[in-house]
Amino acid sequence: MIGVNGTGKSTLLKILAGIENYDSGTIIKKNGIKIHYLPQNPEFKTDCVWDEIQLVNSKNEHPVAEFELKSILTKLGITDYQSTMSNMSGGQRKRVALALALCTSCDLLLLDEPTNHLDNDMVEWLENYLIRSKSAIFMVTHDRYFLDRVCTKMIELDQGDLYIHNGNYEVYLENKETRIEQEKLAAHKHKNLYKKELEWVRAGVQARGTKSNSRLQRFEELRQKRFKQQEESLKINATMQR
């Protein structure tokens, strides 16, 4: 899932994970589906890396072998399995949480910025691991190269609307550019029509017949739509300034 900062990508992941409430709508989940969520700022139930790994692994229907657990930790730069989490940096804690996510047996893996705090070798290893994964993966990432190599579909979140892009990042850029041009053209046509109807209203309606009333109603709809467009434009500008 891609989109500019502040559009609600992380919030949507939390909603899908059942961590955050949503205002309206319905989420339909397959019965028995197992979902695991990797947040940007993880929290743990124990203070020891290995204890946390063992706790997660004990809940798996088919526990992961010990050597594989240690291999995943090592690949992510965690070589002291008895490390105390409270003494770790934020980056180390995020890598431990990523290891926990990869060790968890689930149908859907939700990842929020999984490549943060990873070096190039770790990112390359993670790419190969996720490509081989049997779980469906839904992630938020700003790493376009990682995205290109791992993801098969992109969902763009823009002003509360979702747009699906099948293909790589270049396809997304092309699709978005086309959509923006179409929106500009539609907005230009709407603006011209609004100006024309505004002139008619200001000139005064000579007869209050059915046609005039219909035209007034259409003008009101145009006015409301134009107000909404201006409001959305202000929201976008405010987000960009932040």
Outline where the language-model segments fall:
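ABC ATP-binding cassette signature C-motif
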Residues: 1-187, 239-242
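Flexible nucleotide-interacting loop at or near the entrance of a catalytic core
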Residues: 60-62, 178-242
